[in-house]
């Protein structure tokens, strides 16, 4: 039963990040040359997506930089059409690659994942605003329900070996399930704050500042609970005063919070746990759904 639920969840997420869909409407009224270049960029991005990745030395910046640049160029005028499309393709294909990797690792039920993909595409075409939250929940569900089982299962190990040989000679290190729950609760706290900010703050979109904050370095020596507290104070101040300055501060502290969480996971178990890379990809991919949609 869990196998079917997990497969359906992955199919739902996969259908939501079909590559290039949001860009093809830009091809209307474009020259033939621009359309050819667009398809060429799409094909090149698809090939570059599946490059070799070392999960034992995971760096969130490698995933952040593509989508950060895509957000930045989205604000440019239509004269930079090809640049915009290229970054959009890279960002969407990267998200799709993350989900496809999860589907390779998990023991998926093909028919359930197929129907999940179809339903997600129908919802996307119907332009239902609130179903994005449902997609985010489904993305988190398999990791919560089957983490320990998957790490211990032989099929999980075989899928990982077939996809990329990332096992160390002395065998894998298993992260304690309580550590996963702690990280998950911290991530959900930050994500709930993002939703509250999107609902109640006067400035609904501050992705530029948010992702500049996510490119957080060791210059900021702060605890996660301090960043959460500062974010809550900025959220309350922004709701009361309705001033955009507090919205910018809110996004800044949230960005630092996400970055601190990623850095903490990577530093603590990044070189030992075979599942850390996918856990970080899960968190980051979920944050993208919440922030962008």
Curated annotation (Swiss-Prot):
Give the chief site where it resides. membrane
Q: Which domain of life is it from?
A: Viruses
Q: Which InterPro entries is this protein grouped with?
A: Herpes_U26
Q: Give the location in the cell.
A: Membrane
| Keywords, comma-separated and alphabetical | Membrane, Transmembrane, Transmembrane helix
Q: Which organism is it from?
A: Human herpesvirus 7 (strain JI)
A GO CC term attached to the entry: membrane
Kindly list the organism's lineage.
Viruses, Duplodnaviria, Heunggongvirae, Peploviricota, Herviviricetes
Q: Which gene encodes it?
A: U26
Transmembrane region(s):
4-24, 30-50, 71-91, 103-123, 133-153, 180-200, 220-240, 245-265, 273-293
Topology relative to the lipid bilayer, per the entry, is: Multi-pass membrane protein
Q: What is this protein called?
A: Protein U26
């Amino acid at each position: 039963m869990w196998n079917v639920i997990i497969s359906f969840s992955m199919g739902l997420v996969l259908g939501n990040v079909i590559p290039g869909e949001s860009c093809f409407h830009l091809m209307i009224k474009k020259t033939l040359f621009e359309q050819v270049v667009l398809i060429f960029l799409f094909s090149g991005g698809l090939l570059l997506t599946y490059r070799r990745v070392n999960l034992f030395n995971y760096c969130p910046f490698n995933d952040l930089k593509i989508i950060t640049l895509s957000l930045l160029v989205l604000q440019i005028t239509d004269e930079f059409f090809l640049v915009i499309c290229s970054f959009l393709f890279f960002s969407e294909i990267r998200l799709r690659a993350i989900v496809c990797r999860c589907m390779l690792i998990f023991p998926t039920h093909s028919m359930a994942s197929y129907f999940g993909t179809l339903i997600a595409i129908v919802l996307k075409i119907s332009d239902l605003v609130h179903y994005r939250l449902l997609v985010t929940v489904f993305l988190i569900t398999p990791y919560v329900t089957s983490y320990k089982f998957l790490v211990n299962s032989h099929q999980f190990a075989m899928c990982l070996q077939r996809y990329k040989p990332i096992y160390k000679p002395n065998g894998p290190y298993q992260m304690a399930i309580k550590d996963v729950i702690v990280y998950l609760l911290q991530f959900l706290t930050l994500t709930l704050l993002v939703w509250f900010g999107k609902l109640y703050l006067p400035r609904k979109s501050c992705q530029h500042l948010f992702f500049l904050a996510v490119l957080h370095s060791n210059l900021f020596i702060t605890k996660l609970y301090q960043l959460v507290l500062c974010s809550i104070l900025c959220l309350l101040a922004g709701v009361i005063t309705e001033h955009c300055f507090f919205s910018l501060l809110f996004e800044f502290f949230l960005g630092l919070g996400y970055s601190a969480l990623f850095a903490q996971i990577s530093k603590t178990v990044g070189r030992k746990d075979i599942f850390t890379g996918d856990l970080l990809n899960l968190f980051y991919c979920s944050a993208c759904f919440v922030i962008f949609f």
